[in-house]
Amino acid sequence: MFKDLFFDLLTKHRTLVLAGIGLPIGTIFDTVLRLRNLYYERIASAPQEHAQRVASVQDQVTRWASVPEAERKPMCTDRKTWMNLSTRFEPKHTWHRIKMSGLRDVLSLDIEQQVVHVEPFVTVGQITRYLLPRGYMLAVTLEIEEATVGGLAMAVGMTTHSHKVGLFQENVKAYEVVLADGSLVRATTEEHSDLFHALPWSHGTLGLLVGLSLRVIPVKPYVHMTYSPAYSQQEYCERIRELACAADAPDFVEATVYSKDRAVIMSGRFADVET
């Protein structure tokens, strides 16, 4: 009875709850995350220690593999469950956690090959802050700042530029993976190609990702946007198809759907000047 009344009050007065409790807590949480990111990017960053960090992961996995199979616990990363972009919350506290959350550095940018080399826990926000001042962005850049590039590569990611370049994992040039026996392999389309093609959608079940190379694209200072209303599902679908499949397709295609027969389609093109 009391529980039903409590949730009924929360529902009826949700604006007050959100404004009085949700917003302050969200602001504090966001501030803490930003300070944490600033610390990791400006103070704790040590890309030159990548090899040592990978060796540490290999050592931990090798020791796990040496335990008799009947006594082994399931293996997982030490990334906090609450940080996952998932509806599943696994009981990691009962599993064998591999310490690898320090793998969060941007390692290098190869401008000639248009590839950036990163560690798996680099976030979308972090890599964007690194690339934009240099005139580049990831070929597939999500709007979720705290999403990690490793998670997107091993699961799935797409964005408003995907009609040109495909899904996130289709823009991965190489994976560095520690296998269950502790060995380190580099998977590309030419080397360990079976593993390269199996890693997307695997959610970390085939090995621990310790590094990857991602395709980048050059950017311009501005994006010229065009907004087109649609007044039916057919019009909306046809217009989206036309834009995405055109020979001179815009760089970005997105839409906001307001109802069954009302939507606004947004298309954007890189521009050198503000228009």
Outline where the language-model segments fall.
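Noncatalytic alpha-helical scaffold of FAD-dependent oxidoreductases
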Residues: 1-275
